[in-house]
Amino acid sequence: PFIYIKAYSFDIDERGMEKSYENMKDAYISTFDDIGLDYRIVKADAGNIGGDVSEEFHIIADSGEDLLAISDASDFAANVEVLEYEKDPSELDGQPSPDGKGKLIIKRGIEVGHIFQLGQKYSEKMSVSIKDSSGKGIDSFMGCYGIGVSRIVAAAIEQNHDDKGIIWPYAIAPFHVNVICLDPKKEEVLKECESVYQIIKDAGHDVPVSYTHLRAHETVSD
């Protein structure tokens, strides 16, 4: 299933909205950094949601649906949809970066997050107000923040796999330890495996136990 989580912020003025926006942006950055993904924050089209500021978080992947224009000499990055070029997006590779620094590199990305500064667009229509220090109601300045949880997992797999399967990033690995009991018919082996399992469990970790008669390297690969 596609799992997408949304959050909203409500502030009394534009400065507060901008601060909330930056706080949420930092939280997203921290999340993707902890997972260890290769990602970019890009300028984006606000679309039907609207707002003056809109940015997307994209995991770099050849299978991505979106085309991203990234400067090779600065932090500039944007979804090609917002670039004012007459050229076809596929022809933008090597063109001068809009910020005047370096040239554009075109990459594909998987969108896993989208954040907006909405201003008072919705609060005015829905009468969502906040009282100031004098008790006067002010239409709140809103921010909107979405993150695709299931897409993060899919993108992480896209960036971390080999011909034998998934190489889970530590931060989102289902388990950090797996006890493999080779030749469990031997009582001393089984006893030792159960002892190791209990030690790890007592330390507060979830740990699966695999009982197998395969050779060690075959079991680890599996």
How would you name each of these model-derived features?
Residues 213-222:
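Single conserved hydrophobic/aromatic residue that forms the stacking wall/gate
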Residues 204-214:
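Conserved BB-loop
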Residues 1-206:
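TRNA-recognition modules of translation machinery and tRNA-sensing kinases, especially anticodon-binding
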